[in-house]
Amino acid sequence: MDTCTRLLFAACATLSILHLVQSQNQQGFISLDCGLASNESPYNEANSNLTYISDADFIQGGKTGNVQKDLLMKLRKPYTVLRYFPDGIRNCYSLNVKQDTNYLIRVMFRYGNYDGLNNSPRFDLYLGPNIWTTIDMGKSGDGVLEEIIHITRSNILDICLVKTGTSTPMISSIELRPLLYDTYIAQTGSLRNYNRFYFTDSNNYIRYPQDVHDRIWVPLILPEWTHINTSHHVIDSIDGYDPPQDVLRTGAMPANASDPMTITWNLKTATDQVYGYIYIAEIMEVQANETREFEVVVNNKVHFDPFRPTRFEAQVMFNNVPLTCEGGFCRLQLIKTPKSTLPPLMNAFEIFTGIEFPQSETNQNDVIAVKNIQASYGLNRISWQGDPCVPKQFLWTGLSCNVIDVSTPPRIVKLDLSSSGLNGVIPPSIQNLTQLQELDLSQNNLTGKVPEFLAKMKYLLVINLSGNKLSGLVPQALLDRKKEGLKLLVDENMICVSCGTRFPTAAVAASVSAVAIIILVLVLIFVLRRRKPSAGKVTRSSFKSENRRFTYSDVNKMTNNFQVVIGKGGFGVVYQGCLNNEQAAIKVLSHSSAQGYKEFKTEVELLLRVHHEKLVSLIGYCDDDNGLALIYELMGKGNLKEHLSGKPGCSVLSWPIRLKIALESAIGIEYLHTGCKPKIVHRDVKSTNILLSEEFEAKIADFGLSRSFLIGNEAQPTVVAGTFGYLDPEYHKTSLLSMKSDVYSFGVVLLEIISGQDVIDLSRENCNIVEWTSFILENGDIESIVDPNLHQDYDTSSAWKVVELAMSCVNRTSKERPNMSQVVHVLNECLETCEKWRKSQEVDLSSPLELSIVVDTEINPKAR
């Protein structure tokens, strides 16, 4: 890889001086002391004189805490209090910034045992809709600092804490510092600070006010170096970078003049791209017969021409094109040339790695509009934080968005605020949602007139204003739109639908009579339905088997008053229980469940008639007025996802065990497709729905979305259902469900089993696991796909075979995918091959078994 070089010398001195003056007065700085009481804000921090303010106006929720008392004297004031978030999954700070501005963004976390639990939290940190990093206080000690340099895409910057486990996210401070636009530029994405050293024998950290940009400089000196310093002023000719005088007046060089000056470091991820900034100033008296000249060598490759530092003048070297380090081990060396009589020297060194934030934020005008609507009605929904549309799992309640791809800003297309207790008028900010297709403000207490601007929103297809206190006339322009196909609902309001006069008395009388008749009809219908349930209605007496039915009181006893929680999901909470001295898992339907009685009924009826050793067994169910519950055999090792994601307490699955789990899961799905009459499509195959026994026996679970195929094997139209990332794209596009939809989902599970990767990971360049695998396979690199936790302890032949099988399963065209019987056959072969490898690794297994099904040539692995 060619590396661009750049040496910045004296230029634009006047602009630099003006810039320094602006920086020294903290212009553009944002310094939040998280958890600080509003009545203590603002204050000037004693050491830096930085002005900190309370975070209360920038966050919707959270509670405040204090680090334990024995730490108070050791910490700077911003780190003595904190804000923690026991409620909600995503909690976001919303900061007003300047668009297209280069910011140093620094976030500090100091646990300080504020809760007295000695339980170091672990959670995810997001920048807008993209994951930034995982904060793990257990691995990083009591304090964690994360810093990036990032160019803002809009005037709003969201910094979000996302709960990922049982621990509670917390934060101590947030600091933003504007930088010059053309400094610290990554080739793509942003820069994540790895470290920032200045070379001195002092123990003092340097930051503001010595550093006008409030960078934190860490002191470093190695035993093989000699420390040098000067009291002379060093000219700062580096426009925009502005290194502090205290950094430039000190430095280091090798104690042995013939040795190179060497710095080594290990990257957190071997594939990280590296950017380095080297600050050099000649701060020694160099005699006329002396020369200091050296080359800059990174990983044994020269990256800069021979360089001679200028006396008492600072210069910076950096690479515009990122570097990579083999195996994640990096070595920087300053090596003197044959012409040089003096050893190399260096004053300071900054190390960054590239970080990508690929997902575009929601269209800024849409964000401003929906936040204005939120403010107009005083909405305080816990989900209404951060980006409204992305990531999908954090979509704001009541919104639907059009998300095309990661590079295109999502647009809000539906706003549903029905039954939200809204008061006041319909705000004009709604018209700024220019792509809105559906608007539902029904069943609120809205007053005033129906605004004419609704007629000008050209994409609106549905407007539901029923059940409010609106008055006046419906604008003629809106009635004209209704004639053109707009669905307009304005009943249960004091509204005149036609132009002209109000309803006459006769019309009112007729209306009253009509209402009376309607009420009478509804009463008759209600009485008839009480006598005989309609055929289409789901009734609680429709189950064919009552011999496994339990009362809610029975469930209470089984779970010992719902004492031990072993899992949570879309259905509700799963409790550990005991029935007839046998362990059981009891899944209790939550009142707020996104699923509900229809899926409960589907699962019970299916499991009452379908039995197979690779399907989780239903022991019984509860269906009474007090609640709904499903009672299963207990699978002691939890679900497959927990073991692949490295959940604490879960062991790393060996390669043979992974193949065994894949085969047993495939057998379960195959039985649904071929062994049941009528045939069944699961519709929600994923790693969390594959449960493991104490012996790691795999069984398929969660049949709430399953559909029976009454006629043949042809695809059948149905409402799209499933889980994002596992969903068959052809099914999603056409709404035609087939057995091959399960095959696609199972192919995604196979990729998880092979790689241990998340199905969707926004920190990857190719965030979807299918795209990620396809990209790697272009180079035939199996080692980069297989889970690194296996430490290369796997059979390459069977691994390739499974990768090929997985990629054939996720073919975008369903006809090109294998059926589940073919999948089972191939996995059987893979397991046999693996067993031979395991028993005797001396046996030559380099000749792979050929896949007997058609594989898409575009995604077929190209090398072995």
From Swiss-Prot:
Topological type in the membrane: Single-pass type I membrane protein
Assigned keywords, A-Z: ATP-binding, Glycoprotein, Kinase, Leucine-rich repeat, Membrane, Nucleotide-binding, Phosphoprotein, Receptor, Repeat, Serine/threonine-protein kinase, Signal, Transferase, Transmembrane, Transmembrane helix
Matching SMART domains: S_TKc
Residues the record lists as Phosphotyrosine modifications: 632, 731
A GO MF term: protein serine/threonine kinase activity
EC code(s) of this entry: 2.7.11.1
InterPro entries: Kinase-like_dom_sf (IPR011009), Leu-rich_rpt (IPR001611), LRR_dom_sf (IPR032675), Malectin-like_Carb-bd_dom (IPR024788), Prot_kinase_dom (IPR000719), Protein_kinase_ATP_BS (IPR017441), Ser/Thr_kinase_AS (IPR008271)
Residues exposed to the Extracellular side: 24-507
Stored PANTHER family: MALECTIN-LIKE DOMAIN-CONTAINING PROTEIN, OS07G0107800 PROTEIN-RELATED
Family according to the record: Belongs to the protein kinase superfamily. Ser/Thr protein kinase family.
Protein name: Probable LRR receptor-like serine/threonine-protein kinase At1g07550
Transmembrane segments: 508-528
Ranges in the topological domain labelled Cytoplasmic: 529-864
Post-translational modification Phosphothreonine, affected residues: 551, 718, 723
GO cellular-component term (any): membrane
UniProt keyword annotation of Cell division present: no
Residues forming coiled coils: none
Reaction(s) the record says it catalyses: L-seryl-[protein] + ATP = O-phospho-L-seryl-[protein] + ADP + H(+); L-threonyl-[protein] + ATP = O-phospho-L-threonyl-[protein] + ADP + H(+)
All residue ranges annotated as the Protein kinase domain in the record: 560-831
Places the protein is found: Membrane
First and last residue of the signal peptide: 1-23
